[in-house]
C-alpha cells in the first residue's frame, strides 16, 4: 500500500503537467468551402483594373470654321424669302421687326475678323443716342451737348456706367480723355455691349463734329465665329429698299475682306436672310419671285 507522501507527489506531478488539448473533430472540406478554397492572385496588365483610367482621346482640331456643302440645298430669291418671312411676322408691329442678314464666311478660327461701319441707303435704326467722354466743364463738353450727345463728361459718365445706367447706344471718347478712360477700368462693362471706344473703330477722336456726322445713320458690324450679322431693314421696307441695303452691305464686307493680308484667306460662303421671329432663308442672289402671280409690288403694302 502506497504511503501518503507518495500519493501527494503523484498528485503534484499531475497538476504541473501540460494539459492535453481536446482533439478537434474532423470536418469534411466540402462543408467549409471558404476555408478550404485557396486564395490565389495573379498579376495583370489590364490598365482598367486597379482604378487606372484610359487617357481621353484628343479631339481633332480644325483650322477653319465648319462649313456645309450648299449643293442641292433649297435657296430662295429675295422676294420669295420676304414673302415667307412676312407671313411668319403677321400680327407683329412693323417697326419692331427687323430683317437681318447673316453672312457666313470661309475663314480660319485664329485669323483676323471683319469689323467696320456702313451707311445704308435706307437707315434701319433711327434711335442713335451718343455719349461722349471728354473733360468736365470744358468747351468739348459744351460742344458735345450742342451736337446732341445724351451725356458728356468723365467721372459723371463713368459713375453712370458702373451703376448700369446706359442711356446711350454709342460711346465716343475725345483724345484728351483717353487716359481717364483707361484709369476708369470700365472696359469689362462696356466691352460685352460693344461700346468700348477704340482707335480701330474710330470711336476715339479729336474731331467730335465729323465723328457725330459719320456715326448718325451708320451701322456697325463685326464678325463672330465666322459669321457677320447686321439688321438691314424693317418689316415695312419694300423689296427694292431691302435689296439696295443688302447690296451696299455686301459690297462693304467684300471691300473689308480685300484689305486683309493674302496669307489669311477669307471668302463669302453663304448669305442668309431672317427676321426677328422668323427662320433663316438662304439666298441665291436672285431678286424676282419664282411665282408668276406674285410681283415685288405686292410685298410693299403694310400687312
Swiss-Prot record:
CDD domains assigned: Ribosomal_L1
Alphabetical UniProt keywords: Mitochondrion, Ribonucleoprotein, Ribosomal protein, Transit peptide
InterPro entries per the UniProt record, alphabetical: Ribosomal_uL1-like, Ribosomal_uL1/biogenesis, Ribosomal_uL1_3-a/b-sand
Entry keyword annotation includes Ribosomal protein: yes
Gene3D superfamilies from the UniProt entry: 3.30.190.20, 3.40.50.790
GO cellular-component term (any): mitochondrial large ribosomal subunit
Domain of life where this protein originates: Eukaryota
UniProt key word Heme: no
GO molecular function, one term: structural constituent of ribosome
A UniProt-annotated Pfam family: Ribosomal_L1
Subcellular location: Mitochondrion
Role according to the record: Component of the mitochondrial ribosome (mitoribosome), a dedicated translation machinery responsible for the synthesis of mitochondrial genome-encoded proteins, including at least some of the essential transmembrane subunits of the mitochondrial respiratory chain. The mitoribosomes are attached to the mitochondrial inner membrane and translation products are cotranslationally integrated into the membrane.
Family membership: Belongs to the universal ribosomal protein uL1 family.
Subunit structure: Component of the mitochondrial large ribosomal subunit (mt-LSU). Mature N.crassa 74S mitochondrial ribosomes consist of a small (37S) and a large (54S) subunit. The 37S small subunit contains a 16S ribosomal RNA (16S mt-rRNA) and 32 different proteins. The 54S large subunit contains a 23S rRNA (23S mt-rRNA) and 42 different proteins.
The protein, known as: Large ribosomal subunit protein uL1m
Organism: Neurospora crassa (strain ATCC 24698 / 74-OR23-1A / CBS 708.71 / DSM 1257 / FGSC 987)
